Amino acid sequence: MPDIDTCPICVESPLEDSTTFNNIAWLQCDICNQWFHASCLKIPKIEVNNLHSYHCEGCSKSHGPSIPKRKSKRSKVQIDYVALNDGDVFAVDKSSHPHVDKFLSFEVNANEIDDKINPYIDFRKDITADYALDTRLTRPVLIPRADLDIVDMKLPIEGKEITIDYIANEVGDDTPLDVMDVLTQQGVNPGWNLGKWRDYYNTDELSRDRIRNVISLEISDVDSFGKSFRRPRIVRDMDLVDKVWNDKSPRPKVTKYCLMSVTGSFTDFHIDFSGTSVYYTVCSGSKTFLMYPPTEQNLDIYTSWCLQPDQNYMWFGDFTKAFKGKGCTPSGGFKVTLSPGDLFIIPSGWIHAVFTPEDSLVIGGNFLTLMDLSMHLRIYEIEKVTRVPAKFRFPMFNRVLWLTSWYYYNNKSQFLKDLGQDAHIKNEAHIKSEAHSRGEVHTKTETHAVKDEPQPDQSVQYKTLSCLVSHLQSHYESSKINKVARNTIPAGLIGKDIPGYLAKLQSWLDELSP
């Protein structure tokens, strides 16, 4: 048994060495006086700060559990002078974000549903583009401990070997980094570099001065890290930019992000830019999402919430807005926690907040799909109404849409396929064939043969193309007085006669009219 000044949990492989000793926090049992590394006990920082007396596992059997501090309206908090200096009197306690308590107390937990069919999360072993097109992904998809061969995803090295030191070494210590202050939900100014972030991340949880988060390090051009990482097959098959980008300028860099979050990190409710779908694989640590589906009611409430001048002070889940004559709050919400090795797919438009229970490293990315084009445009309009800064929107979104129109105008069969309509035809044909073999379908005359052939659902095609054409027509009108909008139109590809090109798209749309 080690002496009381040595942590007994990691005695075989000591946590601290000469370079980390001063950065590690300790807890002492008030009964036996044994010292422990706080991180070895895996007690979240927020709980450590609330302890009056710690009892180790052995002593708690005879002396009862640890004793929390007495709660009082006059209890002291760690004053967040940075937030106060910025004029934010809401975030006064810098040990955790003010919304974390409500997040953690949210009761509906998708991980705890025992029903055969989970109403919140689609738990699977694999996911393909065909499955996505068939189901329209009405629920997020979680593949626990995903088999990389099955989902056809490749990590640069084993997930458990992807550490903050590995990332800093591969990407480079001097790489500029956007760091978010969790308490204020604002970027840290002046910015950091990756070397400084690595040192902060490696600091013991209890010794960190503030909670900070990194969620926007794009790594697709990093040689041995990003370039050797292969996104899941479903993402590569459905990514709209992959299909349509036919441009000399660099494509939007949103495909591969490295997210580095410390314990207690919290990102308030948001929708990913332009309603992009998201893939998310956890290398280490864990993440908890609180999610709401993109129903018309929820999106309407979300838009109003974003427009509130005191939005940062308001918990989205409690926000009330009149919808169709009734006072409504967001509905259909649930929590889900991801563990190392999990692959998570968030469909287009989902409203979500994210909490980090323990230090975590994640690789993920965003992608547009033809299937979700109407939702992408719906969220794009919400971003305009709520005045989301250009920095936080999908880069070159309008150029992508012009290129999308050109690609599918010249590849109309692919338009059917990418909407899942060719599968619809094959499925209908198969059903009719099976029924015919059972004698349930009479032989048709030659006159009716063509009429009875299975046809694609034109309403799906029409709705998708209609919202695209409408958006491009509106964008073209804006381009007449807005140089930035004008420069996003790929005239070198579609020609300088933009009205003529739009007329061709309109004719195609008219052909699809149900």
From Swiss-Prot:
* Entries under SUPFAM superfamilies matching the protein: Clavaminate synthase-like (SSF51197), FYVE/PHD zinc finger (SSF57903)
Q: Which cofactor does it need?
A: Fe(2+)
Instruction: Tell me the superkingdom of the source.
Output: Eukaryota
Q: Where is the JmjC domain?
A: 220-384
The note on the cofactor says: Binds 1 Fe(2+) ion per subunit.
The protein's matches in InterPro entries, at most eight in alphabetical order, are given as: Cupin_8 (IPR041667), JHD (IPR041070), JHDM1_Histone_Demethylase (IPR050690), JmjC_dom (IPR003347), Zinc_finger_PHD-type_CS (IPR019786), Znf_FYVE_PHD (IPR011011), Znf_PHD (IPR001965), Znf_PHD-finger (IPR019787)
Q: Which residues hold Fe cation?
A: H270, D272, H352
Q: Which molecular function term from Gene Ontology is one that the record holds?
A: zinc ion binding
Where is the segment annotated Disordered? 432-456
Q: Which UniProt keywords apply?
A: Chromatin regulator, Dioxygenase, Iron, Metal-binding, Nucleus, Oxidoreductase, Transcription, Transcription regulation, Zinc, Zinc-finger
A GO-annotated cellular component: nucleus
What is the name of the protein in this document? Answer: JmjC domain-containing histone demethylation protein 1
Source organism (scientific name): Debaryomyces hansenii (strain ATCC 36239 / CBS 767 / BCRC 21394 / JCM 1990 / NBRC 0083 / IGC 2968)
